[in-house]
Design a protein with these regions (language model features):
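C-terminal alpha-helical cap/extension of soluble enzyme domains
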Residues: 5-16, 38-40, 200-203, 207-295
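Short, amphipathic alpha-helical "lid/cap" segments that border enzyme active or binding sites
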Residues: 25, 29-32, 149, 282-289
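Short helix-capping segments at alpha-helix termini
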Residues: 69-75, 99-100, 130-132, 158-160, ...
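Catalytic alpha/beta core domains of metabolic enzymes, predominantly
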Residues: 128-129, 140-248
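Short Asp/Glu-rich motifs
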Residues: 54-55, 89, 115-116, 146, ...
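Alpha-helix N-capping/helix-start residues
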Residues: 19, 25, 57, 149, ...
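Active-site beta->alpha loop and helix N-cap motifs at the rims of alpha/beta catalytic domains
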Residues: 2-11, 15-144
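A general structural signal for well-ordered alpha-helical segments in protein cores
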Residues: 28, 60, 64, 89, ...
Length: 295
């Protein structure tokens, strides 16, 4: 039987950039340490929130290596290695594996809009050439393709596929996946505003954007769910819904980097084509953070 790569709260960590658009490793190190001090169970590096889509291959590899070294086995490190080019996904995976990462996160190939058969071939090709546990990542709003429960079932027969970060918001898909794949194909929420309902349906935790700002809250929320105290967890989820809405007023990671800058965490700027928040949305975010005592 598989064991989950992690249970609880994994931060989908942002990548700080300096004024010239270069990776700010000093600020990144402080953010990593802040998350570990906040109690996170794992760190996911070079994902959507980490702006991996606008990194060069060399930068991507260097950021994963730095994260692994900075973490130094204090928590698990999950390396984003997804690509719509299967060979590139293998290349990034092998470098992450060599760096000492604990697992890989692989988003569905985007833009290509492959079939379910293509998804299976893509993931099996990667698994055949790597050794680390693989977490699938389903986010059809970004990629244009979604797994079906039947495809999850097919892939789950290979123990290297540890489970899936589910960000589709499709609770029917979640329930069908749980029914078809059994208890040892693990699911994690990819949406901060759906942590409690997903964990009530059997998810093992969250890969969280909000944790960059409120790690202790996300740790507490997931721990309450794992302890089957869904009443207390629900109250916490509801309490922070306004903030979570504000953190997604614009596409991730625009608001979370703005929020980190507001609290002095030096997330820095974004790389084009992403740009700074509108003044109206920034004021809404600032007001929400102030109401929660973060400013």
């Amino acid at each position: 039987m598989r064991t989950p790569v992690f249970t609880g709260n994994c931060v989908a960590i942002a990548t700080p950039f300096d004024a010239n658009g270069n990776i700010n490793y000093d600020a990144f190190g402080r953010l990593i340490d802040n998350q570990i001090e906040g109690g996170v169970d794992a760190i996911c590096v070079c994902g959507t929130t980490g702006e991996s889509a606008t990194m060069t291959i060399r930068e991507h590899i260097a950021v994963v290596e730095y994260c692994v070294k900075r973490v130094n086995h204090r928590v698990k490190v999950i390396a984003g290695a997804g690509s719509n080019d299967t060979s590139a996904a293998v290349y990034l995976s092998l470098h992450a594996q060599d760096s000492g990462a604990d697992a890989l996160l692989h988003v569905t190939p985007y833009y290509n809009k492959c079939s379910q058969a293509g998804l299976v071939k893509h993931y099996e090709y990667i698994a055949d050439r790597t050794e680390l546990p693989i977490i699938l990542y389903n986010v059809p709003s970004r990629t244009g393709v979604s797994f079906t429960a039947e495809t999850y079932r097919h892939l789950s027969q290979n123990p290297q596929f540890n489970g899936v970060k589910e960000a589709s918001g499709n609770f029917s898909l979640l329930a069908h996946t749980r029914f078809l794949c059994g208890d040892d194909f693990y699911i994690w929420s990819g949406n901060d505003d759906q942590v409690v309902p997903m964990m009530a349906l059997g998810a093992k935790g969250v890969i969280s954007v909000a944790s960059n700002l409120i790690p202790e809250v996300m740790v507490k929320m997931t721990k309450l769910c794992l302890d089957n105290d869904f009443e207390a967890a629900s109250k916490l989820q509801i309490k922070y819904m306004d903030l979570m809405d504000a953190l997604f007023l614009e596409v991730n990671p625009i608001p979370i980097k703005a929020a980190l800058n507001l609290v002095g965490m030096e997330a820095g700027q974004l790389r084009l084509p992403l740009c700074e928040m509108s003044e109206k949305n920034l004021e809404t975010l600032r007001s929400s953070m102030a109401r929660m005592g973060l400013l």
